[in-house]
Structure formats: structure tokens, C-alpha cells
Amino acid sequence: MGGLSVGSVVLIALVALLIFGPKKLPELGKAAGSTLREFKNATKGLADDDDDTKSTNVQKEKA
């Protein structure tokens, strides 16, 4: 199962351009990018918290 091909991405971009128009498209891209960045930071924070919890539990077991 592959990802999106170049042709698919171009088709999606053209449909988005037709639906939202050229003036609204940059705003939508910026909003989508910032949302994705926040999501990645949040999931990274959760993973870091999980790693900290595991290392604390291992240290308690050794003591």
C-alpha cells in the first residue's frame, strides 16, 4: 500500500484551488501546517513523558 503519488497530490491541490479559491488557499495551508506542528509537538511530549516514567520505574526497581 503506497502513499500519495505526485499525480494525486496535484489533483488534490487543483480541487482545493477550485473549492476555496486562490485567496483562501494560503491561509488554509498555514493553518494546516500549524495544526500539524502542534500535533507533532504534543505527541512528542507524550512520548517523552512515557520514557521518563519508564526510566523512573526502572530506577525504583534497582533501588
Curated annotation (Swiss-Prot):
GO biological process, one term: protein transport by the Tat complex
Principal cellular location given in the protein's record: membrane
MF terms in GO: protein transmembrane transporter activity
Membrane-crossing segments per the record: 1-21
UniProt subcellular location: Cell membrane
Bilayer disposition of the protein: Single-pass membrane protein
Gene Ontology, cellular component aspect: TAT protein transport complex
Alphabetically ordered keywords of this record: Cell membrane, Membrane, Protein transport, Translocation, Transmembrane, Transmembrane helix, Transport
Function recorded in the entry: Part of the twin-arginine translocation (Tat) system that transports large folded proteins containing a characteristic twin-arginine motif in their signal peptide across membranes. TatA could form the protein-conducting channel of the Tat system.
Family to which this protein belongs: Belongs to the TatA/E family.
Quaternary structure note: Forms a complex with TatC.
PANTHER family listed in its UniProt record: SEC-INDEPENDENT PROTEIN TRANSLOCASE PROTEIN TATA
Protein name as it appears in the record: Sec-independent protein translocase protein TatA
Organism field: Shouchella clausii (strain KSM-K16) (Alkalihalobacillus clausii)
Lineage per the UniProt record: Bacteria, Bacillati, Bacillota, Bacilli, Bacillales
Gene (UniProt): tatA
